[in-house]
Amino acid sequence: MAATLQFDLVSPERRLASVQATEVQIPGAAGDMTAMQGHAPTITTLRPGILRAVSAEGTKAYVVTGGFAEISATGVSVLAERAVPLDEMDAKLMDQLVADASAASSVGVDKDTAEKAMSDLQAMKAAAGF
C-alpha cells in the first residue's frame, strides 16, 4: 500500500475534504507541485486552478481561486479563498459566481478587489473547462 498523508481542504463556506491521500496536486503561485508523504515543509500561495487529491477511493478534483497551502511530511492543509468540487461545477453555478462578482463591483467594492474577483472567475472558468 502506498504511503499516505492527511489532506484537508477548507473554504470560508465549508470543509470540502479531509482524507488520507497518496498525493495532492497543487496549483501553486510559483508553479504546480505534487505533495506526497515525506515532503519538505512548505507554505505556498495558490493560483486559480484545479487542485487534485489522489486517495484509495480515486482522484477528487476541486476548482480553487486562490488561498494558501501548508505542506508537511505528514499532511497538506489548504485554506482556499473559494473552492468548489469540480464535479459540482456547472454553467448555472459559474453564472451565479459571475453575477455575485459583478454585484460586488457595483456596491462600493474597491476597483482592485473587483478586478481580482473577475480575474479569478475567468481563471476558474478556464480551469473548469467552461
Swiss-Prot record:
Free-text function comment from the UniProt entry: Produces ATP from ADP in the presence of a proton gradient across the membrane.
InterPro entries listed in its UniProt record: ATP_synth_F1_dsu/esu, ATP_synth_F1_dsu/esu_N, ATPsynth_dsu/esu_N
Superkingdom, natural source: Bacteria
An MF annotation (GO) of this entry: proton-transporting ATP synthase activity, rotational mechanism
Cellular compartments per GO CC: plasma membrane; proton-transporting ATP synthase complex
Protein location: Cell inner membrane
Membrane topology: Peripheral membrane protein
Keyword flag Transport: yes
Keywords: ATP synthesis, Cell inner membrane, Cell membrane, CF(1), Hydrogen ion transport, Ion transport, Membrane, Transport
Subunit structure: F-type ATPases have 2 components, CF(1) - the catalytic core - and CF(0) - the membrane proton channel. CF(1) has five subunits: alpha(3), beta(3), gamma(1), delta(1), epsilon(1). CF(0) has three main subunits: a, b and c.
Family in the record: Belongs to the ATPase epsilon chain family.
Membrane keyword on record: yes
Name the record gives this protein: ATP synthase epsilon chain
Entry-linked PANTHER family: ATP SYNTHASE DELTA/EPSILON CHAIN, ATP SYNTHASE EPSILON CHAIN, CHLOROPLASTIC
